[in-house]
Amino acid sequence: VQGAGWLTTEELVWNGKGQLMTQGPATYKIPAISDTPPHFKVNLVANRPNGEQTVYHSKAVGEPPFMLAISVWSALRDAVASVGDYQVNPALHTPATPERILAAVDQVKQQVR
């Protein structure tokens, strides 16, 4: 969910003086628990103990789950492409905000006319 926020809502906005205006959660929308799918199940690999002294003997996960969020962006981009019956390869920049998605849809509509 953190990665989905990174690719859809966490937009960097700079003012005319070059100052970052979206410096933290108070200035942009971050994902909330309500953004989690209602059926979100995780299965861990069975019989793979970790001998390291970590919390609950967990294994490090690092960035891979974060990067799996590209599937959210890909699904949005495919949805935009469907507007033109997949005849156009739409440009959808990240973060894929609602405004950028709408602009991409408009661009696809213009190109398939």
Predicted regions and their residues:
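C-terminal catalytic domains of large/alpha subunits in multi-subunit enzymes
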Residues: V1-R113
